[in-house]
Regions:
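Extended beta-strand/beta-hairpin segments
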Residues: 1-56, 67-147
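Active-site-adjacent loop/helix segments that line or gate small-molecule/cofactor pockets in enzymes
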Residues: 64
Length: 147
């Protein structure tokens, strides 16, 4: 059952056994995630890196926020998919993200709903907790079409 009481609290545990092996991330009853450095920093390609987890969080946050906003507006969504990209580069203060882009494709039931869905995507981005926590600002590249 959803609650609107605030504040909400979230907890993640990390266990590292030393060496250059990955770590295990756990959060209550959720599946364990094996993570570590990305290949660019001598990690393994099979590990979930902090960078990939951040983009996953951004993608999932926008989708769930859009579902909530569209649901409250009474707009049925037929299909949603997204792909997130980040550019990591040297900055005056060290390594940092210099670009974050979310490519989103949405399908609605009719052409009459396309502009409404675009508006609701923009609204969802403005309410997305993860997007609001990131620097630089997230660029939304949205494509909405009717089925």
């Amino acid at each position: 059952m959803a609650t609107t009481q605030f504040p909400h609290h979230y907890d993640v545990a990390l266990a590292w056994e030393g060496g250059h092996d990955g770590t295990a991330l756990t959060a209550g009853p959720r599946p364990r995630i094996e993570g570590g450095a990305p290949p660019e920093f001598d990690g393994k390609d099979a590990w979930w890196s902090p960078e990939h987890l951040l983009l996953s969080s951004l993608s999932l946050c926008l989708m769930t926020t859009f579902q909530a906003v569209a649901g409250k507006a009474g707009l049925p969504i037929r299909h949603y998919d997204s792909r997130a990209e980040a550019r990591l580069d040297r900055t005056p203060t060290g390594l940092g993200f210099t670009g974050l882009v979310l490519h989103v494709t949405v399908k609605v039931g009719s052409a009459d709903e396309i502009e409404r869905a675009r508006h609701l995507l923009i609204k969802a981005k403005s309410h997305c907790i993860v997007a609001n926590a990131l620097m630089p600002p997230v660029h939304l590249d949205a494509s909405v079409a009717a089925e």
